[in-house]
C-alpha cells in the first residue's frame, strides 16, 4: 500500500494517546501518568505497543528500562516515560500528527529510544536512517518515506540539507542545527 493509503485505519498508538490524554485529562507536557498508578488495571492485555509501554512504566517505574553496553548509562522506566512524554509534546508542537514520518539519524546513543517511542505516541511513523548514507541516497529515503521531521546530530545536518528534500523541521539532539550556508 502507498505511504498514506495505509491498510490500517489508525496507527496503533494513536488510540492509546487519545485515551491517555483525554480519559485522564493528561497534558503530555505537564502531568505524570505514573501518579495515576491506582487507576490502571493490569489484568487486561495491552492492545498496542504504546499501551504496553505505558503500562510497564506504571507497573515498575524504578526498574531499569535501558542500559548501554558496559552499563555506563541507564534509564529507569519513570525517566523513559517522562522523556517519551516530552518528545511527544515537542513533536506535537511542531505539528507532527498521525500518519506523519519522523526520521532518526544518529550514532548509537540512549536518547534514540525515547525519540523513537515519543514519535510513535503521537501516531507518527518513526524509522532509523543509516548515518553513513550519502546525500543522494538520503534523497530517496526521505522522499520515499515522506519525512516531515528529521531528528539527528549536528554532524549530519549538512548531509540532510544536501538531500534537497523539503523537510519541515530538523531537530538536533546535541544543540541547534547550524545556520544554512548561502
Swiss-Prot record:
InterPro entries: AMP-dep_synth/lig_dom (IPR000873), ANL_N_sf (IPR042099), ATP-dep_AMP-bd_enzyme (IPR050237). It comes from the Bacteria. This is Uncharacterized protein MT1599.1. It comes from Mycobacterium tuberculosis (strain CDC 1551 / Oshkosh).
Amino acid at each position: 500500500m502507498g505511504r498514506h493509503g495505509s491498510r490500517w485505519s489508525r496507527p496503533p498508538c494513536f488510540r492509546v494517546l487519545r485515551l491517555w490524554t483525554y480519559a485522564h485529562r493528561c497534558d503530555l507536557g505537564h502531568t505524570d501518568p505514573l501518579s495515576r498508578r491506582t487507576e490502571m488495571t493490569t489484568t487486561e492485555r495491552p492492545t498496542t505497543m504504546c499501551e504496553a509501554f505505558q503500562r510497564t512504566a506504571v507497573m515498575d517505574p524504578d526498574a531499569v528500562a535501558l542500559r548501554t553496553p558496559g552499563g555506563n548509562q541507564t534509564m529507569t522506566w519513570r525517566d523513559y516515560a517522562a522523556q517519551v512524554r516530552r518528545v511527544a509534546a515537542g513533536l506535537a508542537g511542531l505539528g507532527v500528527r498521525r500518519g506523519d514520518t519522523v526520521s532518526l539519524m544518529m550514532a548509537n546513543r540512549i536518547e534514540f529510544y525515547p525519540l523513537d517511542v515519543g514519535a510513535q505516541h503521537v501516531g507518527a511513523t518513526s524509522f532509523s536512517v543509516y548515518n553513513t548514507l550519502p546525500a543522494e541516497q538520503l534523497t530517496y529515503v526521505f522522499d520515499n518515506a515522506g519525512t516531515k521531521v528529521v531528528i539527528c546530530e549536528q554532524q549530519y545536518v549538512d548531509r540532510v540539507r544536501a538531500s534537497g528534500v523539503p523537510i519541515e523541521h530538523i531537530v538536533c539532539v546535541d544543540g541547534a542545527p547550524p545556520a544554512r550556508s548561502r
